[in-house]
Amino acid sequence: MAGKTFVYVGAEADGLYRKEHNDSQWTKLSKGMPPSPQVRAIAIDPRNSSILFVGTQRGVYRSKDSGESFERMNMDEGRIVWSIKFHPHNPEIMFLGTEGSEVYRSDDAGANWEYVSTIINQDSVQMAFATRILGIGIEPDEPQQMYAALEVGGAAHSSDGGKTWEIVNKEFDGDVDLMDLHGVSVGGPGAKSVFISNRTGVWKSTDRGQNWQDLNFESFSDIRYSRGVETSPNDPNTLYACVGLNFGSEQGGVMRTTDGGDSWTRFDQGVNALSTTFGVAINEHSPEQVYFCTRKGQVFGTLDGGNSWKEHVLPEIAANVKAIACTSG
């Protein structure tokens, strides 16, 4: 399997799929998973690409064999997992975020999970679902500095490794378009900036959320509703952001910046995305390999930094795609 590139996709309908870049078909991965799995988060162990974690409607599951089989990890019952994040320097430490805005931590590589805190924002916008943590960001140089993207509650910052949280919504309070956060990533010069995505595009803070700068996506793209945002593992100034017209639109794409957010260009040139792009994944072993998924189940990948693209057609039953990850095997 050396030298091959594998991509994993998670959907709310029909669970988890895996595909090698050059294969013609996807493999459904369900052994040991809960019935009718709803997969909303995927994280691959940075030390061993055969180990992956998926967040489901019944907690977090781990595979040690590239998804061939799974086992449920030890955590509180009834938790819907929306985000999973490894500590930047110690992969034994992991964090996850749930529906209900709870933060859990593992100190033994994901085997056992302990409740840490609940992020409370009294000004969260009331929706048909409980406020949930769609993304977790961690500063690489000061990993006790953490960030959370709340749908629909804005941004939160922790300075003590997730034990306590401060809502940092100075520019957002009261505006549902700004409070509806979908992703968070740490990057920029020296990896000291935090980027969040919402209905209006991507915003940036250089002072840990005390102030936010609108990066003016409307200057660079005619579609700016943003979902996932990710930093390249080898260059903190390079970030990718998923965009569409709105949640249910029939257009999608990926924006890229190489200067820490000052300017953005369309990365997915020549790609015909027929719904809003929800997730983007960069292969940390080969950062020129980038994949993205759309809400209605299209998956596109490039092995050469966007010069050429290949579409990986998911089975029609895989709908409401929410998560994507890729690695070398």
Predicted segments, located by residue:
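Extracellular glycan-interacting surfaces
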Residues: 1-329
